[in-house]
Amino acid sequence: MNKSGLSLGRGLYAVTPDEPDTARLLAKTSRVLAARPCLLQYRNKFASAALRREQAERLLALCRAAGVPLIVNDDLALALDLGADGVHFGRDDGSAAAARYALDASGPGRILGVSCYGEWPRAVAGAAAGADYVAFGAIFASPTKPSAARAPLGLLGRARRELKVTVAAIGGITLANAGDVFAAGADLAAVISDVFDAVDPCARAEAYRMLSRE
């Protein structure tokens, strides 16, 4: 149980790619959602505001039908306006405490996640500000962010022991190394490429779910 009062579970945290083709994004995401990941994050760093809104709105409808919470990356105003299930904040996205207040004011059960990179003090501050999960990364070399600094696996276990929040790992995670991430202490493996670029995204997402149970 986290600040939002929700159990975020253990397994896959699917994160959408920077996909300009909305039809293709929806088709792939539908297949991922069929495997019931713990969360889906809408992330598109290169889309216009209008396209982000259109894609997020349509993804929210898919998530509602699948019973999977939708988290909006970086954009609290969009998350609140659409009634999404939560927002994910990076270091440049504003105050986590202010986001927590706004989410709580919008209704019960809203989820706040914060990127902590490889920075333990940021995780402590995020948890104190009301984050439901803290995300560390890049755990491995990432095709999405090839220049990202690496975060040690040991942070996952420390967060699991010392913070009363869900622990997520991101960055270069594949089926080949996800077992190490869960064993180190992560509750959630946040994955973009290895799921959305798979020949069968549903089967790949299901494989993560099964792996998290081992």
Locations of regions flagged by a protein language model:
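Conserved N-terminal beta1-alpha1 strand-loop-helix module at the mouth
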Residues: 1-96, 101-132, 148-151, 158-167, ...
